[in-house]
């Protein structure tokens, strides 16, 4: 009972809303000294009046040096559009394949820019609710049943992995001299369009067909 009251008291003391520069500095200093994880300890260690979840999201989506805060490039736009055709509104899966971008960044950019740029049948089927949902990518699905609903997430994971495999094969086929030049460009310009590592998935149109990433078993769950 005492533990519950203490937790309720702590929850009431947590701040919400915009972070201040001072709060950001406290969080960055903590991560610098203690690393990521154990976010709930930050309150006790630093006195920062933010819950562990808020600290984690603030770090992952804004403060982490791995987050690219620059404008989206044409290559990134192309990649996001391709992945959305495969995966629908599964922003976490998409963001893992767009180096330096978070799922929130990708989701917000899709809703505010990319979905409005697309025209025709595909754009009319796009949902812009801003949340992950169970909608199916319009490229493949016209009707879905509930019999395989529980298998859909595994199917999307498998599709994403096949996409990774296609890109990895494309990477291996590139001449070593070209790869070395791209590594230098990436190091000097920080432009992800020059990078062909396993975490960057820009491939030419000729390298794959989206429909080839669906197996017969996958299709069974959607038709």
Curated annotation (Swiss-Prot):
Primary subcellular site in the record, as a coarse category: nucleus
Subcellular location field: Nucleus
Signal peptide: none
Matching CDD domains: SANT (cd00167)
Classification via SMART domains: SANT
Keywords: DNA-binding, Nucleus, Repeat, Transcription, Transcription regulation
DNA-binding feature ranges: 39-63, 91-114
GO molecular function, one term: DNA binding
Pfam families: Myb_DNA-binding (PF00249)
Keyword presence, Metal-binding: no
Disulfide bond sites: none
Taxonomy, superkingdom: Eukaryota
Described function: Regulates the production of a signal that induces hair (trichome) precursor cells on leaf primordia to differentiate.
Full protein name: Trichome differentiation protein GL1
